[in-house]
Amino acid sequence: GVRVVLFTGNHDMWCYDYLAQECGVEIVRNPRVVEFDGVKVHLAHGDNLNISGQPMLKLMNTIFRASGARTLFSWLVHPDLALKFGLWWSGKSRKSHNKTLMGVDNLRPLVEYAREHNLKNGDVEHYIFGHMHLPHYVREERFEVLFLGDWCGAEAVYATMNDDNNLKLNTFAIDETVS
């Protein structure tokens, strides 16, 4: 089979073990450094990284990620209402991360996170993030930062690494008949 790894982020931080047990999906909740052909790559969803200058977001993420809050929510809120709330919240977030409204400046906190991480761990050559739904490439002196963009919609964005260990953003047109 094909190994499937899901890096949880702001829309799936509450996923428990269903996908792991039923589908064999590996769930990753924190950034991870992996090695491909001797090249170290830092992989992360990107949510909740370098948000120290955003106290309300930090507080909200702390509450949403607390196991007690998740347990209370699952016991006290009917699943139909929880789904409606989740769809509303997701739509609100998606509108704030709209590609036409978001500029490259919004990517700066994650590029700064990569700089700080690279200063401490200088052997990482590539940083790959999702979260912002804006495909973009940043080349720094010692490393590259890649933002994958979306994986759904009219076209999916994915990354490849060539024989020279350089990353490249690619797109794949999604046929509307595929579901």
Q: Residues of each region from the PLM?
A:
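Extended recognition/assembly regions associated with phosphoester-bond processing machinery
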Residues: 1-179
